[in-house]
Amino acid sequence: MNQKAVILDEQAIRRALTRIAHEMIERNKGMNNCILVGIKTRGIYLAKRLAERIEQIEGNPVTVGEIDITLYRDDLSKKTSNDEPLVKGADIPVDITDQKVILVDDVLYTGRTVRAGMDALVDVGRPSSIQLAVLVDRGHRELPIRADYIGKNIPTSKSEKVMVQLDEVDQNDLVAIYENE
């Protein structure tokens, strides 16, 4: 794959997350009864970064959980090498029933990952609402899903790939578009 363009560098990612944190606080009139839940892998780190920013702004900690949606994906025909579904589940430290859950992911594309995330959340509890925050929305939805908080809208073609790199995983903060060869 050839890198076509850098969309967000470290500073732009930091700014986008700070703006999203402010939008969350404003929309929810504070963050009481709100839980951030990151979708594995990069969504977890984005949720943690958002929680840090919200705590800096509001002065109160925000609960962060994580979910692994592998079992819930409808577009993965084989989950493991022996054809058994891979069950990871959720690690959410509090009951989400009657709480506002903000699902956090890195890239919104077809909507299938988010749908799987919502399925996983409903298996854990019944939140009063589910909101969606993404660092990048690249379009090309296959399901009627829309993000409530978006770091950056990036129009792409289906032949392009948007890659998010985060320091916690990739030792670098960067969002770039790559062209498939």
UniProtKB/Swiss-Prot annotation:
The protein's name: Bifunctional protein PyrR
Reported effect, residue 18 to A: No effect on ability to regulate the pyr operon only in presence of excess pyrimidines; reduced affinity for RNA; no effect on UPRTase activity
SUPFAM superfamilies the UniProt entry points to: PRTase-like
Record GO terms (molecular function): RNA binding; uracil phosphoribosyltransferase activity
Catalytic reaction annotation: UMP + diphosphate = 5-phospho-alpha-D-ribose 1-diphosphate + uracil
Residues engaged in binding substrate: 41-42, 105-113, 138, 162
Record bears the keyword Cell inner membrane: no
Extra information: Mutagenesis studies identified four amino acid residues that seem to be involved directly in binding of the protein to pyr mRNA: Thr-18, His-22, Arg-141 and Arg-146. Arg-27 and Lys-152 were also likely to be involved in RNA-binding, but mutations may have altered their subunit-subunit interactions. Arg-19 was implicated in pyr regulation, but a specific role in RNA-binding could not be demonstrated. UMP and UTP increase the affinity of PyrR for RNA.
GO biological process: DNA-templated transcription termination
Known outcome of mutating residue 41 to I: Reduced ability to regulate the pyr operon; reduced affinity for RNA; loss of UPRTase activity
SUBUNIT field: Homodimer and homohexamer; in equilibrium.
Effect annotated for changing residue 27 to Q: No effect on ability to regulate the pyr operon only in presence of excess pyrimidines; reduced affinity for RNA; no effect on UPRTase activity
Upper classification of the organism: Bacteria, Bacillati, Bacillota, Bacilli, Bacillales
InterPro entries on file: PRibTrfase_dom (IPR000836), PRTase-like (IPR029057), PyrR (IPR023050), PyrR_bifunctional (IPR050137)
HAMAP family referenced in this protein's UniProt entry, alphabetically: PyrR
Short motif PRPP-binding, span: 101-113
Source taxon at top rank: Bacteria
Protein function: Regulates transcriptional attenuation of the pyrimidine nucleotide (pyr) operon by binding in a uridine-dependent manner to specific sites on pyr mRNA. This disrupts an antiterminator hairpin in the RNA and favors formation of a downstream transcription terminator, leading to a reduced expression of downstream genes.
Noted pH dependence of activity: Optimum pH is 8.2 for UPRTase activity.
Enzyme Commission number, as recorded: 2.4.2.9
Keyword RNA-binding carried by entry: yes
Protein family: Belongs to the purine/pyrimidine phosphoribosyltransferase family. PyrR subfamily.
Keyword list, A-Z: Glycosyltransferase, RNA-binding, Transcription, Transcription regulation, Transcription termination, Transferase
Disulfide bonds: none
